[in-house]
């Protein structure tokens, strides 16, 4: 069933007036004024995500400046994190799991820039699993990217052949999530298991407001 709501206010005005910052349900608390500022990335502008792409929460304008001073080119993409990012995998066979769709957009300019880096032998460093899914969704079998706006349900788990991403920055995820499968696919199950054991031993912070790791 589809319900149409008639209002003199725009969607964004309604969100700003009565909406709440969509902090993850596992926090088990109401959002606060601090969340409105802290639970958004330095890139965040448009409304629509049910959660923040949390790897980028560790970035600041100062860090971005230092990255650029090292000679790196920062390329921005647009994505809207979907509700399924919190959905646990309940199937015994992970291949039977149906992945959630997320809205993504890769501009022509961004695609050209990333393709140029790959063609010149450079590396693509990605912040976040959602960005990783976005890039892999927009690439052909040879790894070349094309402009795209739409949805993706690309499901990445061990055995997947990566086409674009060379290095990945990501937070520590829930053990029964599609996100842990994605990072295990990228780095290998045993390495991720070892990294998580090290994180637990040293009391790293997990999940959205937690620490992140760089997978080389």
For each feature predicted by the language model, list its residue ranges.
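Surface-exposed, charge/polar-rich loops and edge strands
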Residues: 1-216
